[in-house]
């Protein structure tokens, strides 16, 4: 995963297909994007706006000092587990339960592990009924989730064979050990 994270920018650059965004995503904030119509902003020559600041993300992760360590499976799961146990003052103000309803799962920075929004996430065997980090430690990485792939609008399946070949080669290339120092992401 670590080496793939270093190179996954190529996926959005080469295959990005989201140069436009619904105006509601910006919630009235000022933007340098151009107006396409009543409901849409766009950026000329953009590849993937959803992978930038406009896309869905948990801003508390970086602001609260959450750093996920990709240098080993053990460090990855340890840092992810720490993030879901780290309390958030902002979420404490909301509370968990009131008026007979749950407002959120807990008061922590990450409510659940799947709320960590990285472009590359190692995943355990889906048949495991435990938390993802426990599944990873139990059985290792079953597959890697690549969240930077946009649907290809020029094909009925959302991805074509050439894209799949490229991504497969990028993953294989990422398996080659590289002598970089540690990689920890916010």
Across the structure, where does each feature detected by a protein language model lie?
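Generic solvent-exposed, charged/amphipathic alpha-helical segments
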Residues: 5, 146, 168-172
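Short secondary-structure subsegments characteristic of cysteine-rich extracellular domains
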Residues: 158-178
């Amino acid at each position: 995963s670590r080496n793939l994270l270093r190179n996954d920018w190529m996926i959005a650059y080469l295959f990005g297909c989201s140069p436009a965004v619904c105006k509601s995503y910006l919630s009235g904030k000022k933007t340098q994007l151009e107006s396409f119509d009543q409901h849409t902003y766009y950026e000329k020559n953009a590849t993937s706006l959803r992978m930038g600041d406009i896309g869905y993300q948990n801003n508390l992760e970086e602001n609260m000092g959450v750093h996920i360590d990709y240098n080993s499976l053990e460090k990855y799961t340890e840092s992810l587990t720490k993030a879901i146990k780290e309390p958030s003052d902002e979420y404490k103000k909301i509370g968990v339960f009131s008026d007979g309803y749950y407002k959120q799962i807990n008061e922590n920075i990450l409510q659940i592990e799947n709320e960590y929004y990285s472009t590359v996430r190692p995943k355990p065997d889906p048949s495991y009924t435990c938390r993802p980090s426990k599944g990873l430690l139990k059985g290792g990485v079953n597959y890697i989730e690549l969240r930077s792939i946009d649907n290809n609008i020029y094909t009925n399946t959302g991805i074509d064979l050439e894209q799949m070949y490229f991504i497969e080669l990028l993953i294989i290339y990422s398996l080659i050990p590289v002598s970089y120092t540690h990689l920890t992401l916010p």
